[in-house]
Amino acid sequence: MEISGSVLRQLSYVSGYGTPTRSRGVASRVGLRMGTGSGFCDEGHLQYYQDTKKILTPKKLKLLKGFSKLGLASDPEKLAMFHDLQQNLTSDAGEVLLRELEAARAKEKEMKKKRKQEIKAKLKASKMNCESSSSSSSESSDSDGDCDQVVDMNCFRAGAGVVVPAPVEESPLPKTPIVEDTNAKAHRDAMALCSKNDISVSSVRDCIKSESAVVTAAPQKRIEVCMGTKCKRSGAAALMQEFERVVGVEGGAVVSCKCMGKCKTAPNVKVQNSVDHSLARGLDDSVNIPANPLCIGVGLGDVDAIVARFLGESHTDIGMIGAATAT
């Protein structure tokens, strides 16, 4: 038993001793092979440089297209550089043309920026100029068409008078005969109906008189203050309060209205002093008062003058007329 144990110990020692010697010999052989060999074991590192060349070639071709747009035909030196670059993409001419291309692109960007700034400035100016005109076109009232004469308050203060348009000949309409014929026909029809149905004639006459009284109404004089965008900014609210103080607020004598389309000379006021043109004369036929004038550029100091000139001494009765019409 002791002999067999010692033999096994010797065999294991011999086997363990041989293993490191074998591995040491392999490592030495590998080291000798790597030390004596010249170059890399494979050519995979060259793929990086080949890929770089493939990427640079399309970029240079793209630059060539950009160079063709620079107008090189007019400059013989640049044209020669361009042909040289087409034949040899790695030549120094490419750097010169590249700088030319970058300068041209920077110049083009600057021109585009200037054009955008000019367009923006024009749009801003047109927006400021047309702010009032756009609102007036959408909010123009029907009373603007009834205005026959425009009064510039600057000329009015200087004593120049009223801007009178060219007279238009109008054929007189037979208003009264038509009304009389209609009333007479209605009266005859009512009498015939009474005779058939045995109705008293006095009751029918009372009905006809009451209907005619309801239709007839006196024209109301009033002052319309424009409340457009520019007129509001120019103090139309304060102007309306001043007119209410001078004229009175009973019966709606001073009212606000939509834009009249004259906002360039704001604030504006329209005086409705008559419905018929024949009523636009004073007590003296030699003094003509404009019918429904539109006063432009009105200030707070012009309120008394407008009331005295276009409404006359009867402006204190405007509220009474409006109240009678409302009832």
Curated annotation (Swiss-Prot):
Residue segments, region Disordered: 108-146
This protein's GO CC annotations: cytoplasm
Enzyme Commission number: 2.3.1.20
Cytoplasm as UniProt keyword: yes
Compartments where located: Cytoplasm
Keyword Methyltransferase found: no
Residues the entry annotates as binding [2Fe-2S] cluster: C226, C231, C259, C263
Compositional bias annotation for Basic residues: 112-125
Biased composition (Low complexity): 131-140
Keyword annotations of the record: Cytoplasm, Iron, Iron-sulfur, Metal-binding, Transferase
GO MF terms held by the record: diacylglycerol O-acyltransferase activity; iron-sulfur cluster binding; metal ion binding
Described function: Involved in triacylglycerol (TAG) biosynthesis. Catalyzes the acylation of the sn-3 hydroxy group of sn-1,2-diacylglycerol using acyl-CoA.
Membership in a protein family: Belongs to the diacylglycerol acyltransferase family.
Protein name per its UniProtKB record: Diacylglycerol O-acyltransferase 3-1
